[in-house]
Amino acid sequence: MKIGYACTPITTNARTNRRILLKDFSKDKFLSITKQNLDDLQKILEWNIKNNIYLFRIGSDIIPLGSHEINNISWQKEFKDKLETIGTFIKNNKIRVSMHPGQYTVINTPKEDVLYKSIKDIEYHCEFLDSLKVDYKNKIILHIGGVYGDKKLAKENFLKGFKKLSDSSKKRLVIENDERNFSLDDVLDISSKLNIPVIFDNLHNICYGDNSYSLKEIYSLVIKTWNKELDGNMKVHYSEQDIFKKKGSHSPSISINSFLEYYEEIKEFSPDIMLEVKDKDISAIKCINSLKEINKTLNSKAYREEIENYKLLLLQHDKDFQKKLNSFSKDLIEFYNYLDKLLLSPKDIIGFKYSLELAFNILKDRISNRESLYFKKLINEKEYEKAKVYLTKLVKKIEFPPKELSYYISQS
């Protein structure tokens, strides 16, 4: 079982989503930005390994305007060596990667121009994974698309659109249930006709709300769509509802209690779990540590390291948090449960101010005098929320910031 996250880590500011505006497109700019994106992909994968994360979704913008007609540059040849180096790192470290085209990539559309662009976009994603020379266990995830007033016809159009894909794309494509158009049963039906795997998304299933299957029943159905030898381990998406936002919004962090309840129901299937959550790799580390603690393989240093990482965030909500921690056993899951409850509580004004000042002390040697004066001005004016927003901007300028700062800015 691997646990991972999507696209943009929090604990490093390496990123792969640099873009080019159409009006600014040139070969030199394209080569420069693509090189930066690929260099940072390598850094992110190396960083993930250090944090025991072996599942990662690569963002679609890794190759700027990768499927746009303006881009006639043979990026596969230009970056052949770099792409193969990244692919070798992925294979040597048994990392599993995936990609997920955006909502406008729909192969069941009735519009020919949209279908053409959608197929071209899927082929771009496939070409990227192929250029890494990774096997077909590294997938491209796609939603079915729109209903367009006739669900039966929309399903048939998906089957027709699928047939227009290259053989490589067909082998990489997996389909996911969504929250409003195509339910788990719909996706399983399409899967049975195309013989391709299904990605089960728990929150989408809850939002769609058309079945009362237990998780074990769902997993028993979904796992049959995966050929382990060809497609790899069954992969699922796990997320939780943000209680303060509209239905279907992902939570700021994974509640460890909810995750472990989920895990207890599905552990016999040993799936790879992609977390869809705002704090990305931080929640991945949280879930990985918790399962290691359950399986008695957790490094003894992990408890102290995580408290150190979270200390500013804890202080923001409780100036006396240290006294409470002293009453705990050295149990990381107990700590995470305390943390999850604390993050739902109002900020402690005294603790919030103190946490900002401590964060500033960690950061002060890396920022300009002007930035320092402005931050102090916000603190003196008791504009603590604005001070944290400003602090977040400053931290994001650092490629590998101290972890306690990354954890601190991961939550508002």
Swiss-Prot record:
EC number(s) on file: 3.-.-.-
Gene3D superfamilies: Divalent-metal-dependent TIM barrel enzymes
Superkingdom of the source species: Bacteria
Protein name, as recorded: UV DNA damage endonuclease
NCBIfam families given in the database record: uvde
Pfam families: UvdE
Family membership noted in the UniProt record: Belongs to the uve1/UvsE family.
A single MF term (Gene Ontology): endonuclease activity
The entry's keywords: DNA damage, DNA excision, DNA repair, Endonuclease, Hydrolase, Nuclease
Annotated HAMAP family: UV_endonuclease
Biological process, per Gene Ontology: nucleotide-excision repair; pyrimidine dimer repair; response to UV
Role this protein plays: Component in a DNA repair pathway. Removal of UV LIGHT damaged nucleotides. Recognizes pyrimidine dimers and cleave a phosphodiester bond immediately 5' to the lesion.
PANTHER family: UV-DAMAGE ENDONUCLEASE
SUPFAM superfamilies attached to this UniProt entry: Xylose isomerase-like
